[in-house]
């Protein structure tokens, strides 16, 4: 898919250990001249961890994308009626978020963005970041 001139939502959930690598991918995406709207789950938006300060990640995303972070269900809800995204990328997508998506639960900014975007029949790309043992059920 040629991304120049396309509008892309880039949603991040709480797999904090992957944030530095994911932000590098956002930079690559920005280099394609796509118009990027960052979306962060409430947890990703507000939680400081050993991998970095939330405010630093938010600031960096806004600088790269040139748009404010969508960070609430109310803000994400607008994606549906306006149908302004051509593509929604969820990276990293935690196992918890994946389970919510699979069951139609839209109680966070990211899951609501996905629901609203899918309403328009447009593609969602999910990059799962979770422990493989969680996915296959091994203890």
Describe the residue ranges of each PLM region.
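A cross-family phosphate/adenosyl-ligand binding-site feature
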Residues: 1-139
């Amino acid at each position: 898919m040629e991304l120049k001139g396309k509008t892309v939502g880039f949603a991040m959930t709480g797999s904090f250990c992957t944030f530095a690598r994911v932000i590098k991918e956002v930079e690559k995406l920005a280099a394609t001249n796509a118009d990027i709207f960052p979306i962060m789950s409430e947890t990703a938006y507000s939680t400081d961890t050993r991998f970095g300060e939330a405010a630093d990640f938010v600031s960096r995303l806004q600088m790269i994308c040139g748009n404010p972070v969508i960070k609430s269900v109310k803000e994400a809800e607008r994606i549906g009626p306006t149908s302004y995204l051509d593509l929604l990328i969820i990276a990293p997508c935690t196992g918890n978020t994946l389970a919510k998506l699979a069951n139609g639960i839209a109680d966070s900014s990211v899951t609501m963005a996905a629901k609203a975007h899918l309403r328009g029949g447009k593609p969602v790309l999910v990059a799962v970041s979770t422990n493989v043992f969680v996915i296959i059920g091994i203890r």
